[in-house]
Regions:
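Short acidic-hydrophobic sequence patches enriched in Asp/Glu that either
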Residues: 49, 53, 135, 156
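Gly-rich Lys/Arg/Thr-decorated short loops/hinges at beta-loop-alpha junctions or inter-strand turns
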Residues: 72-76, 141-145, 162-168
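A short, conserved beta-to-alpha structural element at the edge of catalytic cores
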Residues: 130-154
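Cofactor-binding active-site loop characterized by glycine-rich and histidine/acidic residues
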Residues: 1-130
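Histidine- and/or cysteine-centered catalytic micro-motif in compact active-site loops
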Residues: 121, 141-143, 176
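Generic beta-strand/beta-sheet core signal
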Residues: 31, 110, 139-141, 174
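Conserved thiamine diphosphate
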Residues: 102-103, 152-177
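Residues at the starts of beta-strands that form the adenosine-phosphate
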Residues: 106, 134-137, 170
Length: 177
């Protein structure tokens, strides 16, 4: 919650009136949708939609579902989550488009450590530095857990820091709590 609150209230230039194009504003992509309650709470308190709508979480016909989707029409949701690994690839495309259109704003994307086991993640990890996408910030929630158990037991990936540095990323570690 702290990380998303800091991004939406202190770091990112974002407009709760929301338009999907995001011209002239920073964009946040939520790739690890299973932690959606935190994301929805930040969006509601930032003014993207009424806070009272949070009480409808996962109810039939609610716009606040277990995994955010663009289909629900909820302001602040730019991509559907659920298919792990897509967020960074979409972020690369958006960062490249912003640069090509002369928009100097930043794309932020949040992923989970279990999600790092998806092949598409590594294509994006190679693509971004190769194309000098300096307007892209990838955040990995490295909590050591995924749906099938501890990430080290499901599929050991080793040091994310070492891998991303080897691909040409500037890497920073932080305690997000």
């Amino acid at each position: 919650a702290d990380l998303l609150t800091a991004l939406y209230f202190e770091v990112m230039e974002n407009d709760p009136s929301f338009n999907m194009e995001g011209k002239g504003e920073d964009i946040f992509l939520f790739s690890n949708g299973h932690i959606s309650p935190v994301f929805y709470s930040v969006l509601a308190h930032r003014g993207y939609f009424p806070v009272k709508e949070l009480a409808t979480f996962r109810q039939i016909n609610s716009r606040v579902q277990g995994h955010p989707t663009t289909h629900e029409g909820l302001p602040g949701i730019r991509i559907s989550s659920g298919s792990l690994g897509q967020g960074p690839s979409v972020a690369c495309g958006m960062a490249l488009a912003k640069r090509m259109n002369g928009d100097d704003k930043t794309i932020f994307v949040l992923t989970g450590d279990g999600e790092q086991q998806e092949g598409q993640i590594w294509e994006a990890a190679l693509f971004a530095p190769h194309n000098k996408l300096e307007n892209l910030v990838l955040i990995i929630d490295d909590n050591g857990q995924q749906i099938d158990g501890p990430t080290e037991e499901v599929l050991r990936l080793g040091s994310f820091e070492d891998k991303y540095k080897a691909f040409g990323w500037d890497v920073m570690n932080m305690d997000g709590n």
